[in-house]
A protein has these predicted regions:
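N-terminal trafficking/processing presequences and adjacent post-cleavage segments
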Residues: 1-24
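Short intrinsically disordered terminal tails
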Residues: 1-2, 83-85
Length: 85
């Protein structure tokens, strides 16, 4: 899992996101957001920090999920990363 967390952090930092980020915290937030949801495609919004909103574009499968796009809305600006690339 540590490698997955590092990949998440790397992709977010590459978007120009100006704040400290934990790949594990993002992964845990996604898991909390999708808990109990049916298979399908979703756009989920999460107040990741007091003044930061993360918008996840996720496809939920039987035993897994795919995070396509992540948009991070902060006072510093809007940052986006595509996890499918």
């Amino acid at each position: 899992m540590n490698e997955l967390y590092r990949v998440i952090e790397k992709k977010i930092k590459a978007s120009g996101y100006p704040r400290a980020i934990s790949g594990e915290a993002v992964y845990d937030d996604i898991c909390d957001q999708i808990d109990g949801k049916e298979n399908g495609m979703y756009i989920l919004m999460s107040k990741f920090e007091k003044d930061v909103v993360f918008e996840y574009h996720i496809t939920i499968l039987d035993d897994d999920f795919n995070l396509g796009l992540l948009t991070m809305r902060t006072p510093e600006g809007v940052f986006e990363t595509n996890f499918d690339r």
